[in-house]
C-alpha cells in the first residue's frame, strides 16, 4: 500500500513551500491538493458572496475520501480540477497514477476521522495569522482574480471564523507541527533529515 503524507494548516501558512522541501528527499510521489475538491458554486442555491469556502461542507468530502482510499490501495484516480476564477469544477480531470508516496495538502484534511485514518504522517504548518492573511491577499488578487475588498470581506466573515472553528483544532492530530511555515529552516531540516533517512533505509515503512 502507498504511504500518505498529509500537510495541513490555515490558508497561506506555507504548505506549498513545505511540499517543495519534502520533494527534494522523496524521489517519486504524487501531490493531491484538497482545493481541487471544492464544490462548484453552481452547486449551491445562493450566490458566491454567501458561500463559505472555509467550512468542511464546501468540499466534496466523499469523493476526496474515495480518491485517497483508492490511491492508498495503488489504484489510479481521475482527479478533478477546480477553477478559482469562475469558482467551478472544470470538465476535464487529471489521471493520477499512484506512487509509493502520496502527498496530500489542504486546510481541512485532518477534520474528518475517516480521512485522518488514511494518512500515515500528519504535518501541521502553524503560521501567524497576519502573515497568512498577507500571503492569501497577494495570492487571491494576483492568481484568482479577486479584489482587495472581496478578500478582506471573506477573511472577516468566514475565513477567520473557519480557521478557529475547524482548522486550528486539528493540530492535536499532527505528528509534527512546524511553526512559521515554510521559513522555519530548522524544522524543515529535521523533517527532511527524517525523510531522507527513511528513503535510504529502503522506504517509508516506518510511518
Curated annotation (Swiss-Prot):
Enzyme class, spelled out: transferase
Q: Name one Pfam family in it.
A: PRK
> What SUPFAM superfamilies does the entry give?
P-loop containing nucleoside triphosphate hydrolases
GO BP annotations, alphabetical order: CTP salvage; UMP salvage
Residues the entry annotates as binding ATP: 9-16
Q: Which reaction does it catalyse?
A: uridine + ATP = UMP + ADP + H(+); cytidine + ATP = CMP + ADP + H(+)
GO cellular component: a single term: cytoplasm
Its pathway is: Pyrimidine metabolism; CTP biosynthesis via salvage pathway; CTP from cytidine: step 1/3; Pyrimidine metabolism; UMP biosynthesis via salvage pathway; UMP from uridine: step 1/1
Indicate where this protein resides in the cell. Answer: Cytoplasm
Q: What is its EC number?
A: 2.7.1.48
Keywords carried by this UniProt record: ATP-binding, Cytoplasm, Kinase, Nucleotide-binding, Transferase
What's one GO MF term for it? Answer: uridine kinase activity
Family, similarity comment: Belongs to the uridine kinase family.
Cross-referenced PANTHER family, in alphabetical order?
URIDINE KINASE (PTHR10285)
Please state what the protein is called.
Answer: Uridine kinase
Origin species, per record, is Borreliella afzelii (strain PKo)
- Taxonomic classification: Bacteria, Pseudomonadati, Spirochaetota, Spirochaetia, Spirochaetales
What gene name is listed for this protein? udk
